[in-house]
């Protein structure tokens, strides 16, 4: 759900436009509830309690939160988890927790912003400023937990900043064999720099970590909000620990049961559809240098993007021209929320009419967590690749080609960037944990699933599928043009539905549909 941070920094772009390992240690508990581990070998981990302290002395947390963690509402803690759940005595890692508390005695609400690879710690300031309502935060402490391998929780490392720049700027490999080889080389780089976390940053382990976090927070049940990829972690948790499910909201739902190439197919179609809305709106407003029907504008955009392969555009950084890969990344990033479409129109107009790729490069960098000095604030790029490669199982060549043909047929503009996902998994040098599966969560308390009708990254029908899989799933349909629904600007229908459920346990009425405000 990186669009939250993108929205938080989009004001800067608007200004630009106007100008042109250890063992677990006992800590002081918030609660004294005795919590039993699911197996005796894990009891020491479950006996931990989060020892909250001021964050100001933690330079890493301060950097990740742009200094906000020094404010009195923020507190920090660490929780120790086993590196391998199959062998809990074989080393440990630490998870970074940061909470935002406005009310004394409030319950903890754990959230995951998405990804995989998205840092909850890094996103916490923007989440409490723009996403969670004051009403919700009056009843809950908002707890950010970076999953294993991500952000400040034993981050997996693969590439240097310079190598990441090169990787992001390069056009995707064209053939199956090239994809496999590129994946193999990247995987070997991860194994060289992070031999343990390159093997143990899978979602199954991250989900089990969540239960130790629950215990460390002194809670019999976990209250949780997951956005995008965070819905997958939440669904896995509910299926594995149904009796520990408290109030669960899964917004922008992934279907946990489908293979990687089907995920790619859904996203290719979702972005292709939202791009059509964006082109039509930009044309009507006279904001883009494209003319004609939607299909004609898509063709013109595709032709222009192709020219960037041989002739990338100059930018404000003389050493970093705008390539096709970077331009596509920027445009897609701005499709996550229709409130950022104006920036996409301006960036495209600057690039096509003025031969200047500066705006689109800045957007692509913001989305990738690249800082002005050339470093990357988080390891989101590395973590995204590693986690997906560990989570998914590759399809055989025949099945993979079937999906590729469908993607190219149904998403002619963007489809090329979404095909042959299984080839990347197959080339990865670490065996997949194959964590994707159908979930039931038998016996769990009600789980609220939210799907937005024109969500480009997590299509609405995935929310329908997840709701059907979960025995206690309850679907809230939201009509809108963005990725995930809940935020302060979502309108009362959405925020009241979610807040009432989280605070009082009252589910929205069966079949309820909300409408996001039009931008």
Q: Language-model segments: which ranges?
A:
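Bacterial N-terminal signal peptides that target proteins for export
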Residues: 1-8
């Amino acid at each position: 759900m990186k669009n939250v941070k993108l929205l938080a920094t989009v004001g800067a772009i608007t200004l630009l436009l106007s100008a042109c390992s250890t063992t677990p240690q006992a800590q002081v508990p918030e609660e004294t509830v005795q919590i039993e581990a699911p197996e005796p070998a894990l009891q020491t981990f479950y006996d931990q309690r989060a020892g909250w302290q001021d964050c100001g002395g933690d330079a890493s947390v301060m950097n990740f939160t742009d200094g906000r963690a020094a404010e009195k509402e923020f507190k920090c803690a660490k929780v120790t988890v086993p590196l391998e759940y199959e062998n809990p005595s074989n080393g440990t890692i630490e998870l970074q927790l940061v909470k935002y508390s406005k009310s004394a005695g409030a319950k903890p609400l754990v959230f995951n912003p998405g990804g995989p690879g998205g840092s909850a710690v890094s996103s916490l300031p923007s989440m409490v400023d723009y996403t969670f309502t004051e009403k919700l935060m009056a009843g809950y402490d908002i707890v950010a937990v970076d999953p294993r391998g991500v952000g400040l929780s034993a981050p997996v490392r693969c590439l240097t900043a310079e190598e990441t720049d090169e990787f992001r700027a390069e056009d995707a490999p064209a053939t199956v064999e090239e994809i496999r080889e590129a994946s193999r080389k990247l995987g070997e780089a991860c194994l060289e720099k992070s031999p343990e976390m390159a093997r143990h940053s899978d979602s199954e382990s991250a989900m089990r970590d969540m239960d130790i976090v629950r215990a460390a927070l002194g809670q019999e049940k976990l209250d949780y909000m997951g956005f995008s990829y965070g819905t997958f972690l939440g669904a896995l948790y509910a299926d594995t620990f149904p009796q520990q499910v408290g109030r669960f909201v899964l917004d922008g739902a992934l279907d946990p049961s489908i293979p990687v190439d089907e995920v790619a197919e859904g996203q290719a179609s979702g972005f292709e559809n939202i791009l059509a809305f964006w082109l039509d709106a930009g044309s009507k407003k006279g904001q883009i240098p494209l003319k004609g029907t939607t299909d004609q504008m898509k063709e013109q955009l595709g032709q222009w993007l192709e020219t960037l392969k041989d002739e990338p555009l100059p930018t404000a950084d003389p050493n970093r021209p705008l390539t096709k890969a970077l331009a596509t990344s920027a445009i897609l990033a701005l499709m996550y929320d229709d409130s950022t479409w104006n920036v996409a129109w301006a960036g495209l107009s600057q690039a096509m009419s003025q031969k200047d790729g500066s705006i689109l490069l800045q957007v692509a960098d913001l989305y990738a967590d690249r800082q002005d000095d050339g470093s990357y604030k988080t390891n989101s790029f590395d973590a995204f690749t590693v986690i997906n490669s560990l989570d998914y199982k590759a399809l055989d060549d025949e099945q993979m080609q079937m999906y590729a043909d469908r993607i190219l047929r149904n998403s002619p503009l963007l489809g090329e960037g979404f095909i042959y996902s299984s080839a990347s998994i197959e080339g990865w040098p670490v065996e997949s944990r194959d964590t994707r599966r159908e979930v039931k969560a038998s016996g769990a308390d009600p789980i609220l699933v939210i799907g937005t009708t024109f969500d480009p990254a997590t299509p609405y029908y995935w929310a329908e599928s997840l709701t059907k899989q979960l025995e206690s799933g309850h679907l809230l349909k939201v009509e809108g043009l963005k990725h995930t629904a809940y935020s302060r600007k979502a309108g009362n229908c959405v925020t009241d539905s979610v807040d009432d459920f989280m605070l009082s346990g009252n589910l929205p009425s069966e079949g309820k549909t909300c409408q996001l405000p039009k931008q």
